[in-house]
């Protein structure tokens, strides 16, 4: 399944707020999940499916990419769900978004694809690049790019940057301090349901 490029409002009406996809928050429609005993199995599947879709649309990844992340998380030591979230949160496009350099993850991905982002002084044009502690992230020295970033930073600094990241507004440089903990995730999600959804595939 390819990356979603359709109307974003339609997605958040169905799944709820997804700040990585869009900063819009329209009225949500009431859930139509049937809670009767006869449909319990179907309802539980749908709940897991929707949690999985939240991750996919929020981080802007394909079905195959998400499945690969689940497989990596399963092989690592620790909580599979928490490790899965850490893998997604440490993607370069997401780190740029969480630093406040862009209003959405698709916007961050565009900066990376257009070779505007430096990691430790080197151009990185792979949005899925996995950031690690002590990585420095900044914009390439281009007036247009810097103007866009400065405008975004000024607006989004009112939102608290998570503790695992730091942004130096004078140097216009972000720093990954450490691997984030569960409390720093910028999305309301039940990752255990996602792991359960993939239990037969990963």
Swiss-Prot record:
This is Small ribosomal subunit protein uS4c. It holds the Pfam family S4. One of its GO terms (molecular function) is rRNA binding. Residues 90-153 form the S4 RNA-binding domain. SUPFAM superfamilies: Alpha-L RNA-binding motif. It comes from the Eukaryota. PROSITE patterns: RIBOSOMAL_S4 (PS00632), S4 (PS50889). PANTHER family: 30S 40S RIBOSOMAL PROTEIN (PTHR11831), SMALL RIBOSOMAL SUBUNIT PROTEIN US4M (PTHR11831:SF4). Gene3D superfamilies: Ribosomal Protein S4 Delta 41, Chain A, domain 1, RNA-binding S4 domain. InterPro entries: Ribosomal_uS4, Ribosomal_uS4_bac-type, Ribosomal_uS4_CS, Ribosomal_uS4_N, S4_RNA-bd, S4_RNA-bd_sf. Part of the 30S ribosomal subunit. Contacts protein S5. The interaction surface between S4 and S5 is involved in control of translational fidelity. It is found in: Plastid, Chloroplast.
């Amino acid at each position: 399944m390819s990356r979603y490029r359709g109307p974003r409002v339609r997605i958040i009406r169905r799944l709820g707020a997804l700040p990585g996809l869009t900063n819009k928050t329209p009225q949500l429609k009431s859930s139509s999940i049937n809670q009767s005993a006869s449909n319990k199995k179907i309802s539980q599947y749908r709940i897991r499916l929707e949690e999985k879709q939240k991750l996919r649309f929020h981080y802007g990844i394909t079905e195959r990419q998400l499945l690969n992340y689940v497989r990596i998380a399963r092989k690592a030591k620790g909580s599979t769900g928490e490790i899965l979230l850490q893998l997604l949160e440490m993607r370069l496009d997401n780190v740029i978004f969480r630093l406040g350099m862009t209003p959405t993850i698709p916007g961050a991905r565009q900066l990376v694809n257009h070779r505007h982002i430096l990691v430790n002084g080197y151009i990185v044009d792979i949005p899925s690049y996995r950031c690690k502690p002590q990585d420095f992230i900044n914009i390439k020295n281009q007036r247009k790019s810097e103007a866009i970033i400065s405008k975004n930073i000024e607006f989004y600094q009112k939102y608290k940057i998570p503790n695992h990241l730091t942004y130096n507004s004078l140097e216009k440089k972000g720093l990954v301090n450490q691997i984030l903990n569960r409390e720093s995730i910028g999305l309301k999600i039940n990752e255990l349901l996602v792991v359960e959804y993939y239990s037969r595939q990963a």
